[in-house]
Design a protein with these regions (language model features):
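N-terminal basic, low-complexity leaders that serve as flexible interaction/assembly modules and, when applicable
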Residues: 2-92, 128, 132
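Short, intrinsically disordered, charge-balanced linker/junction segments flanking boundaries
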Residues: 1-2, 190-192
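Short, flexible active-site loop motifs that bind/organize anionic cofactors or intermediates
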Residues: 1-2, 45, 116, 164
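Active-site-proximal, glycine-rich beta->alpha crossover segments in alpha/beta enzymes
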Residues: 85-191
Length: 192
């Protein structure tokens, strides 16, 4: 591929692979939902966390209005853990959602990846928003699907305090929590 043949997507992929590019891609791999853009496009939190149309609209705003060379969504690290049973405070227009209750702080009795994981919580909204974004920006714009990794998922399921204690005193529970979290993260990532 010659330098002039790069699309936004092929340029980002080449840069991530350490290959030569015509210019450094400009994108955000963390969330991009800022209050000014929410106001500009009429897609604000917390509604844009649950409504796929608003989620897509806000995500595309940074590409269209700010010139970022990728679209990134969703806007928090609680989508997967909500589907796994964590209670979530959905935040406000200028505050991201956060975990307020952990389902397994004492033991992992009953802990497992739900068979219907991809139909739980906000996961369907995120997956639908990704489809909407792809339809609107076409195949040549990178879409960055943000999500929690296994350590974040595990520590949210059991609480950071238990997770840290288990890493030293109950390594079997620590490893089990990570196994469950890894399985869930892989399923969610593959669906994105």
């Amino acid at each position: 591929m010659t330098m002039s043949e790069f699309t936004l997507k092929t340029r980002l992929l080449a840069a991530l692979e350490g290959k030569p590019v015509d210019k450094v891609p400009v994108c955000s791999v963390t969330q991009t939902g800022i209050v000014e853009l929410m106001d500009e496009v009429g897609a604000a939190w917390p509604e844009a966390h649950t409504n796929p149309e608003l989620m897509a609209k806000l995500a595309i705003a940074n590409y269209e209005l700010s010139g970022l060379e990728a679209v990134r969504l969703p806007y928090c690290l609680t989508v997967l853990v909500e589907a796994m049973g964590c209670q979530i405070n959905m935040g406000t227009k200028n505050r991201q959602p956060s975990v307020i209750e952990h389902p397994y702080p004492k033991s992992l009795d009953g802990a497992a990846v739900p068979a219907d994981l991809l139909q739980k919580g906000r996961i369907p909204a995120v997956l639908e928003a990704i489809k909407i974004v792809r339809e609107k920006v076409g195949p040549d714009v990178p879409i960055i699907g943000g999500m929690e990794g296994p350590i974040t998922v595990a520590s949210d399921l059991v609480s950071v305090k238990s997770f840290m204690k288990w890493s030293i005193k109950k390594t079997d529970l620590f490893e089990q929590a990570l196994d469950i979290a890894t399985e869930a993260a892989i399923a969610y990532a593959n669906a994105m």
